[in-house]
Design a protein with these regions (language model features):
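Core residues of folded domains in eukaryotic genome-function proteins
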Residues: 4-9, 36-40, 94-96, 126-132, ...
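Catalytic metal-binding/acid-base residues of hydrolase active sites
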Residues: 14, 47-48, 151-153, 230-233
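Eukaryotic intrinsically disordered and solvent-exposed regulatory patches
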Residues: 26-29, 82-87, 116-120, 128-132, ...
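Acidic, polar low-complexity intrinsically disordered regions
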Residues: 35-36, 52-53, 57-97, 101-129, ...
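Catalytic lobes of large eukaryotic enzymes
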Residues: 71-82, 148, 161-410
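Conserved beta strand-loop-helix elements of the APE1-like EEP
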Residues: 92-112, 132-137, 152, 317-335, ...
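PP2C/PPM-type serine/threonine phosphatase catalytic core
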Residues: 99-101, 107-174, 226
Length: 447
């Protein structure tokens, strides 16, 4: 094992159940060669209707099971590939993350942490982020890897709101251990990797940090991958009635005004990254694929049979690269100590459109070093975003998430009663029961 091969897919599910067989056919298309990845991460947005997503639990099981089945089917197509274990699945509202490890490598996961934050209405999870951090052992090293699934504010004119959402994610997404019984062991394992004294809290104001260690998005010894529908567009305003005539079409001629590279110049995320206003410290591989959003209903209807000779876009939205995957490069102190170490991008591309969504999935294949990121030197204190993050952790992060979760349950119950067939059936049964009881009571009184 010369590298930790990591494969990430982000997909906006449009609140529909994915077709496992179709998803499986293309899930691993971005692998540079038919070799099973060591870590497989799925970042899912709008994973289910709001009622099921906010209530969570068993209501989401049918949606997650389809992705588990898709991974199982896709893995069988890899020569000498093993089956995968879903080591963790978490959601915050409508945004979810799933992590898979080959069965024969599952014992390499030494600890797991998860965290999440809502950035939607009243900090609820109609928009937000959910993440995991794992300790992956290789020989005598423990490699820390964090992956975050995110869904930011929509619309062409929502640029500032998207940047604000990112700020709130950095301030509010805090990782805590999954298994409380393993907390003490995990804390000891990580102590040698963290630039923190035994008595110094990892976060200000957190309770007994030896038994409940916590960490923010940026951590000195951890890799970080961000994947999701970040919703950055190619215009600040909606298109005019004639703009669609120059929407991208399949062509290799870069001088053609309809070649996607011309629209890519207007990409908001690229300009905001350069200006240092969002996704601080993260980088992205070169984009060599068409916009991933928004495809028309007509294009979706023929998604599984289309020959790709044309792209049919929704005319009321500028085609945009909403779905993105970014990563944090190795810190300078690691490059200095271990010059050959590097993060290698094997492939970054979009996957075929599917009939259940107006977004195309996006996949990234990365090879990470099998040596852990060392504890930074004192001289590196301000040289990396891992040590000097753009925003501080909100000391009220736990209370805010708990309050938002209570609101999600209320909204989920109301949506369940009004928007789902189960809820409407329940209301009808209650009405029929109440009416029947009223008539029985009136009959008794009449006699």
């Amino acid at each position: 094992m010369s590298a930790l091969n990591t494969y990430i897919v982000t997909f906006n599910c449009a609140r529909e159940k994915v077709d496992p067989k179709v998803f499986a056919c293309h899930l691993l298309d971005a692998l540079p060669k038919p070799q099973a990845p060591d870590v497989l991460i799925l970042s899912l947005q709008e994973v289910a209707p709001i009622a099921y997503a906010f209530l969570g639990g068993s209501y989401l099981t049918p949606y997650f099971d389809r992705f588990r089945h898709a991974v199982e089917v896709a893995a069988t197509a890899i020569p000498n590939g093993s089956q995968y274990t879903n080591i963790i699945t978490r959601n915050v509202g409508m945004t979810a993350i799933m992590a898979f490890i080959p069965n024969d490598q599952a014992n390499r996961i030494k600890w797991l942490e998860t965290g999440g934050v809502g950035v939607g209405v009243q900090q609820m999870g109609n928009k937000g982020a959910v993440g995991l951090r794992m300790g992956y052992s290789y020989e005598d090293e423990v490699i820390e890897l964090a992956a975050v699934a995110a869904h930011l504010a929509p619309m062409e004119n929502g640029l500032e709101r998207r940047n604000e959402d990112w700020k709130n994610i950095v301030r509010g997404l805090v990782f805590t251990p999954v298994n409380e019984n393993a907390v003490r062991t995990a804390t000891k394992l990580r102590a040698s990797h963290r630039n923190t004294g035994e008595d110094e809290p990892l976060l200000p104001g957190s309770p007994d940090n030896f038994t409940i260690p916590t960490s923010g998005l940026y951590t000195p010894t951890s890799h970080l991958i961000l994947a999701g529908d970040l919703n950055y567009r190619t215009s600040r305003s909606k298109p005019s009635p004639v703009d669609y005539r120059l929407y991208p079409q399949p062509t290799k001629d870069v001088t053609d005004p309809r070649h996607y590279s011309n629209l890519l110049k207007e990409d908001q995320l690229s300009s905001e990254l350069r200006a240092g206003r969002t996704c601080h410290g993260l980088r992205e591989a070169s984009i060599r694929f068409a916009p991933t959003y928004k495809y028309s209903d007509k294009q979706q209807a023929v998604a599984e049979t289309n020959d790709g000779s044309t792209w049919d876009w929704a005319k009321h939205r500028f085609p945009s690269w909403c779905d993105r995957i970014l990563y944090l490069d190795l810190p300078l102190w690691m490059k200095t100590e271990d010059p050959p170490a590097s993060i290698r991008v094997n492939n970054y591309t979009s996957l075929p459109l599917m009939s259940t969504s107006d977004h195309r999935p996006v996949a990234l294949s990365l090879s990470l070093p099998t040596t852990a990121i060392p504890t930074p030197t004192e001289a590196a204190a301000d040289s990396d975003v891992r040590i000097n993050p753009p925003f501080t952790i909100n000391p009220q992060w736990r209370q805010r998430r708990a309050t938002a979760r209570r609101k999600e349950i209320v909204v989920g119950l109301l949506a369940f009663l009004v928007l789902t067939w189960e809820g409407r059936t329940l209301i009808l049964a209650m009405i029929v029961g109440a009416s029947g009881g009223w008539f029985i009571m009136m009959s008794i009184l009449a006699t």
